[in-house]
């Protein structure tokens, strides 16, 4: 059994890397581990909103992290401080047993039962992805195979993917479903080689009815893993078994992804999810508030929705901050109170986010050029290389899509951005001067302000 403190420190490090500073401080630093047994990890959180957020967004990552750290499969149980207080057994025991049943994962699949189509808020930015996911769930293996869902972090890709798994399982409880991240797949593959159990690994992944692989972009620099996944994909596809993949970008935009995998991924349907518009953000907040029995006026929800444009996770984090602020001050939630509660969040979320114009200004100043030079079409070396560096930095240091980067740097095509990124990456391995310039610019941008 692993040491609980060491395990929690490992999980904290993972969350610190994956979440925004605001998200980390809101969700992770306010939680603490209570007890670890051979099949359960109890985690205490401050309030019901935190609990709901953990159950929806974080428990999957806990399961993965515990397995990575200790090769132990556990079901996270998220409880508020009040729920952890001792009480008469006759009153509390049945409720706790019901909570355990409702909150834990379906052990066989690692699917979060809260990720369902009913709980998914549909908007302009995700309606096509939602429709495609529902079609796949209702008739797996017959249409849109594979289904490739792509987009930025916190926009609902994992929710849709797991909703497919949950609906398939509801319709057919005997279905063999495998949900993993690309990192899980790679780790399982490596372990199978080390333990000489490759055949067992292949049986586990190739005899499923539905394979769900999250964050497929991390296959990019893993040649042997790509080889293994190629054969796994072919076996499932030929047997008309459904494959669903998610990524932060299109298949042909994933660096170092084999062309034959790009071709396989493009066989089905690729659909994107984009940041929710204002109406959708308001609907998400109303849905969340109703689920938590929070009394919040419509104008206050509209105000909160207007402050957070990035993704659903940050949006829900903002609602939690407002609710906590209301509790602390013992005041009803109003627009004025929400504005006070979100002051720090607004500063972190907007001021701290690097933009493409900031990158262009820094690169232009560094190379003694103008921003217009970088956006222009001149092909002289003194401008081309800084322009490529700007594209490289925009790709590495922001969450903007390739088309967005190209558009803001003079209306270039997204393939130009890909070429620039690859060119600078390759040049940095042989040109020490260029490498030093890129590192210096990175530091300038990180320490801006």
From Swiss-Prot:
Question: What residue spans carry the region label Domain IV, binds dsDNA?
Answer: 327-449
UniProt feature coiled coil, ranges: none
The Gene Ontology CC terms held by the record are: cytoplasm; plasma membrane
Q: Does the keyword Secreted apply?
A: no
Q: Which UniProt keywords apply?
A: ATP-binding, Cytoplasm, DNA replication, DNA-binding, Lipid-binding, Nucleotide-binding
Localisation per UniProt entry? Cytoplasm
Q: Please list the GO biological process terms of this entry.
A: DNA replication initiation; regulation of DNA replication
Q: Main localization of the protein? A: cytoplasm
Q: Which positions are annotated as binding ATP?
A: 154, 156-158
* Entries under SMART domains matching the protein: AAA, Bac_DnaA_C
**InterPro entries given in the database record:** AAA+_ATPase, Chromosome_initiator_DnaA, Chromosome_initiator_DnaA-like, Chromosome_initiator_DnaA_CS, DnaA_C, DnaA_dom, DnaA_N_sf, P-loop_NTPase
Chain residue ranges for the region called Domain I, interacts with DnaA modulators:
1-72
HAMAP family in alphabetical order: DnaA_bact
Q: Which family does it belong to?
A: Belongs to the DnaA family.
Function of the protein: Plays an essential role in the initiation and regulation of chromosomal replication. ATP-DnaA binds to the origin of replication (oriC) to initiate formation of the DNA replication initiation complex once per cell cycle. Binds the DnaA box (a 9 base pair repeat at the origin) and separates the double-stranded (ds)DNA. Forms a right-handed helical filament on oriC DNA; dsDNA binds to the exterior of the filament while single-stranded (ss)DNA is stabiized in the filament's interior.
Q: What is this protein called?
A: Chromosomal replication initiator protein DnaA
Which gene holds the coding sequence for this protein? dnaA
């Amino acid at each position: 059994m692993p040491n609980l403190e060491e395990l929690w420190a490992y999980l904290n490090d993972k969350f610190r890397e994956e979440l925004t500073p605001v998200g980390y401080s809101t969700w992770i630093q306010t939680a603490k581990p209570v007890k670890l047994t051979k099949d359960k990890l109890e985690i205490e959180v401050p309030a019901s909103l935190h609990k709901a957020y953990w159950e929806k967004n974080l428990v999957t990552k806990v399961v993965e992290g515990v397995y990575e750290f200790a090769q132990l499969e556990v079901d996270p149980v998220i409880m508020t401080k009040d729920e952890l207080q001792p009480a008469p057994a006759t009153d509390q025991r049945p409720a706790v047993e019901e909570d355990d049943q409702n909150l834990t994962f379906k052990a066989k699949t690692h699917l979060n039962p809260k990720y369902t189509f009913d709980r998914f808020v549909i908007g302009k930015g995700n309606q096509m992805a939602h429709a495609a996911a529902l079609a796949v769930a209702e008739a797996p293996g017959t249409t849109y195979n594979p289904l490739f869902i792509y987009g930025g972090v916190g926009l609902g890709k994992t929710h849709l993917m797991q909703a497919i798994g949950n609906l398939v399982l509801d319709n057919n409880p005997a279905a063999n479903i495998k949900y993993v991240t690309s990192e899980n797949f790679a780790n399982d593959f490596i372990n199978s080689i080390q333990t000489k159990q490759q055949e067992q690994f292949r049986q586990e992944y190739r005899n499923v009815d539905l394979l769900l692989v999250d964050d497929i972009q991390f296959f990019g620099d893993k040649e042997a893993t790509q080889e293994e996944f190629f054969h796994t994909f072919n076996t499932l596809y030929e047997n008309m078994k459904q494959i669903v993949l998610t990524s932060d970008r299109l298949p042909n935009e994933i660096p170092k992804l084999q062309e034959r995998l790009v071709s396989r991924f493009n066989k089905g349907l690729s659909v994107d999810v984009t940041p929710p518009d204002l109406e959708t953000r308001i609907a998400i907040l109303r849905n969340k508030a109703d689920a938590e029995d929070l009394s919040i006026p419509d104008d206050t929800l509209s105000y909160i929705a207007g402050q957070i444009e990035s993704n659903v996770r940050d949006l829900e984090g903002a609602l939690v901050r407002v609710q906590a602020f209301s509790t602390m001050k013992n005041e009803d939630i109003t627009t004025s109170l929400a504005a006070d509660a979100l002051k720090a969040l607004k500063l972190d979320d907007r001021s701290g986010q690097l933009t493409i114009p900031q990158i262009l200004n820094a690169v232009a100043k560094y190379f003694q050029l103008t921003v217009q030079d970088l956006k222009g079409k001149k092909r002289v070396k003194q401008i081309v290389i800084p322009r490529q560096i700007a594209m490289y930095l925009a790709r590495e240091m922001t969450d903007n899509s390739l088309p967005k980067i190209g558009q803001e740097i003079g209306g270039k095509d997204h393939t130009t951005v890909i070429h620039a990124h690859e060119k600078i990456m390759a040049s940095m391995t042989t040109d020490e001067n260029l490498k030093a310039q890129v590192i210096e610019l990175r530091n300038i941008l990180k320490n801006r302000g």
